[in-house]
Design a protein with these regions (language model features):
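Extended, charged alpha/beta regions that create polyanion-binding interfaces
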Residues: 1-46
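Short glycine-rich or small-residue beta-strand-to-loop segments that form or flank ligand, phosphate
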Residues: 11-15, 48-58, 97-101
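Glycine-rich phosphate/diphosphate-binding loop of Rossmann-like nucleotide-binding domains
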Residues: 56-93, 97
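Gly/Ser/Thr-rich active-site loops/lids in small-molecule metabolic enzymes
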Residues: 70-76, 143-169, 197-206
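A structural-propensity feature for long, helix-poor, extended segments
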Residues: 86-117
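Glycine-rich phosphate-binding loop
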Residues: 111-162
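Long, charge-rich alpha-helical interaction segments
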Residues: 191-224
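Single conserved hydrophobic/aromatic residue that forms the stacking wall/gate
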Residues: 241-250
């Protein structure tokens, strides 16, 4: 009914996510870790997990995926060389990562690159991080969406690419996304919506296709003025999920 693939979809509403409150962001990281552990099969067992940072690091609003990967604790190479004893642990997930870039840079579909890496490194699960397009200005930089249904890179801004999901890769794919841009038509629609809320037609624009006059704005995407700081802050929040520690209480 929603036009989405079947799966589990979780939205973490975090209104203060745009604020530089370290304690708040730590709580969000811990809750996100809980949700990941619920979605990744057999997470209590040691696994090899590949984290994919989707997006273009040269476009600030689209750099969330690459920024998260930059901040991750990567250990696959060390464990394969020296074993878990290098970290003083008896039990530990192996974490690897890749930033496949965008087709304009590589000439390849993101799904092709990821599939090649999966075939060579054989991870048990895939975690994909991407910036999303918001359906409401109230969600901009304020929600974290998690799903086990995979992801279609670029679909939020109309660039439809091959899907990255369990069907195409053969392993569980968990997608994490934060809306960092919103199209101009949505901004106008939200503004009009707020003006007619008392008229008894609340939800008029949200529940319908945009009128023709607004549809001309659909190719224009807007982000917040402090998006560089916001993306950097969000990247730390998403990277502190402690996914490498299977014995962690959450």
């Amino acid at each position: 009914a929603m036009g989405k693939p079947m799966g589990t979809y979780v939205t973490l509403e975090a209104p203060a996510l745009i604020e530089p409150d370290e304690d708040y962001h730590r709580e969000v990281s811990e809750e996100l870790a809980k949700q990941l552990r619920n979605l990744i099969p057999d997470i209590e067992k040691e696994q090899s997990i590949l984290v994919v940072g989707l997006g273009n690091r040269d476009v600030t609003a689209d750099a969330l995926g690459p920024e998260v990967v930059d901040n991750l604790f990567i250990n696959r190479h060390v464990i394969k060389e020296y074993g878990k004893a290098a970290y003083g642990c008896e039990k530990m997930h192996m974490i690897s990562s890749i930033v496949p870039g965008v087709m304009a840079m590589t000439g390849m579909e993101t799904a092709e690159i990821v599939k090649g890496v999966v075939e060579q490194t054989k991870p048990d699960a895939l975690v994909v991080v991407d910036a999303l397009a918001a359906r409401s200005t109230k969600r901009l930089n304020r929600t974290i969406q998690v799903s086990d249904a995979g992801i279609h890179p670029g679909s939020g801004v109309g660039n439809h690419r091959n899907a990255i999901n369990k069907e195409s890769l053969g392993i569980p794919v968990i997608a994490i996304g934060v809306p960092t841009v919103v199209d101009a038509a949505t901004i106008v629609g939200d503004a009009i919506e707020s003006m007619i809320q008392e008229s008894g037609e609340e939800g008029y624009f949200f529940n319908r296709e945009h009128p023709k006059a607004l549809s001309e704005l659909n190719n224009m995407y807007v982000t917040s003025k402090d998006i560089d700081e916001t993306v950097k802050r969000l990247s730390f929040t998403l990277s502190l999920i402690h996914i490498s520690e299977p014995t962690r209480p959450y």
